[in-house]
Regions:
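Acidic di-acidic motifs
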Residues: 8-10, 85
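Hydrophobic residues at beta-strand termini and immediately following loops
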Residues: 37, 102, 133
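Two-component/phosphorelay signaling modules centered on CheY-like receiver
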Residues: 11-35
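Helix N-cap/capping motif at the beta->alpha junctions
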Residues: 36-42, 64
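Conserved sequence signature across two-component system core domains
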Residues: 7-8, 37, 53
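Extreme N-terminal starter segment of soluble prokaryotic enzymes
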Residues: 1-4
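CheY-like receiver
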Residues: 45, 50-125
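Short, Lys/Arg-enriched segments at the junction into DNA-binding effector domains
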Residues: 119-140
């Protein structure tokens, strides 16, 4: 089962992102567990394993880049997709090898595209990720 984390201090973003991800996974028939966090400290306390994490860069108390570094130190190499209002963080964000960097506001088409790319990457990288992705041309 695919494990996805959404971490953004803005609950509005979490509430916008969750149904987009759920709908995408439902259409592709991919089972997943999705965890939501609005507090980066709680995320760091829990330190859950994940396949894909949507992570805000600018949060109170904890910076998303520092959160990602903490996960990397624990050898968690899931795919991190940054969400932010601040494009200037892109250079620094790449120090933890994120899979993607999306600017807000949330765009469903961009979310779906990066989800598809991340799932294809995970499937190629790890044989135990065999979930197949339904596209317009069939199952990949």
């Amino acid at each position: 089962m695919l494990s996805i984390i959404i971490c953004d201090d803005d609950q509005t973003i979490n509430h916008q992102l969750l149904p987009i991800i759920q709908q995408y996974l439902e259409q592709k028939k991919i089972p997943a567990a999705i965890q939501q966090y609005t507090d980066a400290k709680k995320l760091l306390e829990d330190m859950p394993l994940f396949d894909i994490m949507f992570l805000d860069v600018e949060m109170p108390e904890e910076n998303g880049i520092e959160v990602a570094k903490a996960f990397r130190k624990q050898s968690n190499w899931g795919q991190i997709i940054y969400l932010t209002n601040y494009a200037q963080y892109a250079q620094t964000a790449y120090s933890v090898h994120p899979f993607g960097y999306l600017t807000k506001p949330i765009d469903e088409e961009n979310i779906n595209k990066i989800l598809e790319e991340a799932l294809e990457y995970l499937e190629k990288k790890s044989p135990h990720h065999q979930f197949g992705v339904m596209t317009d041309t069939g199952i990949k």
